From Swiss-Prot:
Pfam families: PRAI. It comes from the Bacteria. Its EC number is 5.3.1.24. HAMAP family: PRAI. One of its GO terms (biological process) is L-tryptophan biosynthetic process. Keywords: Amino-acid biosynthesis, Aromatic amino acid biosynthesis, Isomerase, Tryptophan biosynthesis. This is N-(5'-phosphoribosyl)anthranilate isomerase.
Length: 206
């Protein structure tokens, strides 16, 4: 079971998550996000993440290919997460030089908003229509992908991770709000530990 901790804004949070076994550490570059990180902080988080064997991920919304590549080159990020549409510009370069996670919105009733075929090797990540809110969609009504590696996000936390994995059998899980201190963007060490350890243990059983 792959675990992605998203919306990381400080190297200490990245370090603790990686030491606990997180596979991906996500940094947000979307302008409107409360978790948006600066380039200097992202570079520090990226260095910490790589040193501990995890993969840093840049999360982008409504940025062009050139903007994404510029940020990745300045920070050392090699995996990017896109949301609901591919960016304008030379997509071929992005697909050639970077690993891609592609977030697909799911309505509250479990229906995929815009079903589409993805290029090979692009990892689909199914999330609520507005990510980072701590809300989930109807897992029981959602039709899980078959014969492909995919990840689940949307309202996950230590209290419901067992139900989520047992219901949908994802290959990876992604969390932000569910492991944060209340009303803050910093991660809670106790929640990080509970979430990551539970996901790893449960993942071995499916």
């Amino acid at each position: 079971m792959k675990v992605k901790i998203c919306g990381v804004t400080h190297p200490e949070d990245a370090e603790y998550a990686a030491l606990l076994g997180a596979d991906y550490i996500g940094m947000i570059f979307a302008e409107k996000s409360k978790r948006k990180t600066s380039l200097s902080m992202a570079k520090s988080i990226t260095n910490t993440t790589k040193r501990l064997g995890a993969e840093p991920v840049g999360v982008f919304v409504e940025q062009t290919t050139d903007q994404i590549i510029a940020i990745c080159e300045q920070t050392g990020i090699k995996t990017v997460q896109l949301h609901n549409s591919f960016p304008s510009g030379s997509l071929e370069k992005l697909l050639r030089d970077y690993s891609i996670i592609y977030a697909i919105s799911v309505r509250e009733n479990g229906d995929v908003c815009h079903p589409q075929s993805l290029p090979p090797k692009v990892i689909p990540l199914y999330d609520t229509e507005k990510g980072g809110t701590g809300k989930q969609f109807n897992w029981k009504a959602f039709s899980s992908p078959r014969d492909t590696f995919w990840m689940l996000a949307g309202g996950l936390n230590p209290a419901n991770i067992e139900e989520a994995i047992a219901t949908l059998h994802p290959n990876g899980v992604d969390v932000a709000t569910g492991v944060e201190f209340p009303n803050k963007t910093r991660k809670d060490p106790d929640l990080l530990k509970a979430f990551i350890q539970s996901a790893k243990i449960l993942g071995e059983k499916i």
